[in-house]
Amino acid sequence: MTVGRPREFDINQALEAAMRLFWSQGYEATSLQNLLKAMGISKSSFYEAFGSKHQLFEQCLTLYANTLIASFREDLQKAKSGLIFIEKVMKSLVEEASSKGEKCGCLMVNTTNELAQRDKIIAKLVANGTKSLQGVFEEAVRRAQKEGDIPVSKAPEVLSSFLVSSLIGLKTMVKGGADAQTIRDVCGVTITALQ
């Protein structure tokens, strides 16, 4: 029995590099050569570790969603209130619009627009990520209702869907070049609609 050669690269770093590239360029515009260069690996290592570009993309999308959800959950736990968490998320969009760096939007939203209509596997991954995101916002809304910041007469499930829809729209606006004041105004309307 022969033992295969050990991997000569960190699979997590390679996955992270691929995720950033897909996020910046999209799935179709990212070539295998782009991926190999960004990941710092050979073609044979790529196929051995990831199988195909599509399989790699599935892993990248899952990594993105899991990282985003974990970050939001942690922020919610640390927040002084559910409403403060929601306001902080909105404020981060204003900061993103104000930054001079590349505005890539949201990988899940970008992927929905690019692939979800014609790729059932990707559509399911995006739907699962969106459902998890709605779960975090529903938890924030329920907490804010217990704290008296959002009326209990409003359905948490509906408000969480509203917040995720707003977040998706705002991320798209930021990616499209909307100025910080416009994003700030829309965020303000979003928060007001909760109360």
Feature annotation, model-predicted:
Residues 85, 100-121:
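Amphipathic alpha-helical segments used for helix-helix packing
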Residues 22, 31-32, 43, 53, ...:
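Amphipathic alpha-helical segments enriched in hydrophobic/aromatic and basic residues
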Residues 1-25, 29-41, 55:
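Basic, helix-initiating cap at the start of DNA-binding domains
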Residues 124-128, 146-162, 181, 185:
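All-alpha amphipathic helical-bundle segments outside canonical DNA-binding/catalytic cores
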Residues 59, 73-103, 156-160:
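Hydrophobic alpha-helical connector segments
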Residues 104, 109, 154-173, 186-192:
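Hydrophobic alpha-helical segments that form the core
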Residues 1, 88-96, 131-147, 166, ...:
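C-terminal peripheral helix-coil segments that are non-catalytic and often amphipathic
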Residues 40-50:
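Short hydrophobic/aromatic patch on the recognition helix
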